[in-house]
Amino acid sequence: IADIASPKELTDEDVLWISGPDYLKCLDNYDVVFKSPGIVLERPIEEYKCRILSQTQVFVECFREQIIGITGTKGKSTVTTLVYHLLKESGMDALLVGNIGIPAFDHIEEITPNTKIVFELSCHQLEYMSVSPHIGVLLNLHEEHLDHYGTMEKYVAAKYHIFSNQKPDDIFICSTQCLPPRGICPSHIMEASFREESEEDFDSGMRKGQGIQVICGEDRAAVNF
């Protein structure tokens, strides 16, 4: 275990503790390193000899096709909870996990092939991800965590991992206010808007300016499972 803080007491003799200000310099001594969200690496991840993973990365690798990943600067806990309850009330086997305060691996035994996993993802969880969920949702982008990222561009780049490693048959649902530049999203983009100045509908069937009716305002479902 590498940590900048010094452990007050070592209760497990089988654990090697590496502490102090240079604790990150030991990473290349290992084949695989699990990184906690929010830790800033000293150099780009591709420059390390070891493979740097996280619990989120491994979980998404294992259950990618079943995951609805939701991120955004504001409102992601509310929307994640809403989506979970919509799925549950419709009779689906749904699981709520992630940055909302529910560690994903604590509920792994509950997952079946039919489980829909609603996963709240923070920028710190997404920052070094090399895999994206089957369905990714980006609600909004505002200036935040710039003490960690330094620039808005780096913060946005972390959020974009919600879709950047998707496949062509995956789905990316995004607010019109934070659509990525044309050509960088490999999956099918479905736009949604909460603005009221337009009454037009999207080709996807989702309606502009209707808030919750973006999902419930049409005769057909916006996304089928």
For each predicted feature, which ranges?
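NAD(P)-binding Rossmann-fold cofactor-contacting core
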Residues: 1-10
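Active-site-proximal loop->helix
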Residues: 9-14, 106-110
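A noncatalytic interaction/capping subdomain that flanks phosphate/NTP-handling catalytic cores
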Residues: 2, 32-34
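Generic beta-sheet signal
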Residues: 2, 20, 55, 173-175, ...
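Adenine nucleotide phosphate-binding catalytic loops in nucleotide-utilizing enzymes
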Residues: 149-156, 187-225
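Glycine-rich, highly charged phosphate/nucleotide-binding loops
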Residues: 12-26
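Phosphate-binding loop of NTP-binding sites
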Residues: 24-30, 37-188
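ANL superfamily adenylate-forming
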Residues: 11-13, 47-53, 198-200
